[in-house]
């Protein structure tokens, strides 16, 4: 596989400081304006990130053992960890980007199990200990592009999803892979209260074609910045597909099913004209209400330092993944 790492010093960026075009999407779909408004405290907190004011401390996770394959490393200074762990999209804990860090401590991950079923010869149920014993972890520095128009670069720790799927031995009927987030309203307040969770249908679900899931770039991610994922980043295990928009990166996964037909996905069900199943990063296919031709790389400087730059096809991974979509109309299959 040809390694592509089109990164510059300005590409290593913090978790987005921008609030929620998607919040606006929900509002325009007719949901409660009160649930979608940005509180003054959160707005002030947003400005403090740009001004370099007080920030929450970085989440303190368990250090992980991992290798660092050279083709996935960028010799660049990473943005402080507290920005990645303190500003997140995870609607199960609220709509504001500060909500997950504030409220995700209710998530219980100690006895986590992940089930692999469906069109497989060997269904599996694995604990996180099983996963760490069976699958060697490695750090990969990946670009991440949000559908909202911002991007960053994150040092994930994880392993190739394809290795887990191979262990389950997919049958010849398997064509797609469906993913499910934990459904636990007692732990995830957004699942219990539509006002908090934006009115999404929970649990959050996502999907990939089998060949996308088997691609070597596709990760099941267990850590960030060398430590176990904190709850707000999708602990204890999440999906990372670097050539797709960030909403494909489903968090806190409890079930992976290999299936015959294209599975439903949360944002596509909510607004199919705005969020496609494929969700490949594509500067030539705009969101119905904003351009995807450019993006904001969010750095550690002030708000005046935030500048737009061209969005790369497949988020810069075209040499590695474009062949998956040969002959497919990317405008129709967005």
UniProtKB/Swiss-Prot annotation:
GO MF annotation terms: metal ion binding; molybdopterin cofactor binding; oxidoreductase activity, acting on a sulfur group of donors, quinone or similar compound as acceptor
Annotated residues for binding of Mo-molybdopterin: 88, 91-92, 146, 181, 233, 238, 249-251
Locations listed in the record: Periplasm
One of the GO biological process terms: protein repair
One cellular component term from this protein's GO annotations in UniProt: periplasmic space
Required co-factors: Mo-molybdopterin
This enzyme's EC code(s): 1.8.5.-
Role of this protein: Part of the MsrPQ system that repairs oxidized periplasmic proteins containing methionine sulfoxide residues (Met-O), using respiratory chain electrons. Thus protects these proteins from oxidative-stress damage caused by reactive species of oxygen and chlorine generated by the host defense mechanisms. MsrPQ is essential for the maintenance of envelope integrity under bleach stress, rescuing a wide series of structurally unrelated periplasmic proteins from methionine oxidation.
Family: Belongs to the MsrP family.
SUBUNIT field: Heterodimer of a catalytic subunit (MsrP) and a heme-binding subunit (MsrQ).
Descriptive protein name: Protein-methionine-sulfoxide reductase catalytic subunit MsrP
Source species of the chain: Erwinia tasmaniensis (strain DSM 17950 / CFBP 7177 / CIP 109463 / NCPPB 4357 / Et1/99)
């Amino acid at each position: 596989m040809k390694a592509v790492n089109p990164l510059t010093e300005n590409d290593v960026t913090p978790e987005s400081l921008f609030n929620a075009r998607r919040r606006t999407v929900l509002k325009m779909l007719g949901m409660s304006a009160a649930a979608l408004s940005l509180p003054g405290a959160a707005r002030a907190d947003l400005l403090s990130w740009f001004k370099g004011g007080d920030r929450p401390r970085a989440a303190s996770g368990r250090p992980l053992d991992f290798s660092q394959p050279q083709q996935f490393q960028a010799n660049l200074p990473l943005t402080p960890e507290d920005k990645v762990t303190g500003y997140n999209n995870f609607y199960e804990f609220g709509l504001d980007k500060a909500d997950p860090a504030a409220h995700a401590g209710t998530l219980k991950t100690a006895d986590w199990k992940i089930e692999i079923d469906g069109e497989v010869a060997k269904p599996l149920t694995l604990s996180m200990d099983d996963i760490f014993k069976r699958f060697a972890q490695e750090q990969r520095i990946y670009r991440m592009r949000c559908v909202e128009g911002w991007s960053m670069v994150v040092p994930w720790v994880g392993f190739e999803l394809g290795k887990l799927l191979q262990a389950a031995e997919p049958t010849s009927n398997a064509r797609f892979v469906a993913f499910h987030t934990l459904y636990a309203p007692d732990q995830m307040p957004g699942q219990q209260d539509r006002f908090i969770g934006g009115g999404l249908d929970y649990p959050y679900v996502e999907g990939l074609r089998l060949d996308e899931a088997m691609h070597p770039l596709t990760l099941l991610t267990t850590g960030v910045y060398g430590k176990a994922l904190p709850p707000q980043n999708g602990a204890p295990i999440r999906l990372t597909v670097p050539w797709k928009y960030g909403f494909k990166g489903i968090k806190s996964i409890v079930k992976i099913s290999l299936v015959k037909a294209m599975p439903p996905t949360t944002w596509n069900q909510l607004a199919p004209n705005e969020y496609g199943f494929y969700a490949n990063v594509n500067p030539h296919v705009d969101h119905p209400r904003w351009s995807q031709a450019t993006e904001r790389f969010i750095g550690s400087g002030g708000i005046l330092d935030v500048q737009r730059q061209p969005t790369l096809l497949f988020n810069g991974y075209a040499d590695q993944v474009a062949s998956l979509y040969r002959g497919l109309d990317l405008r129709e299959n967005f």
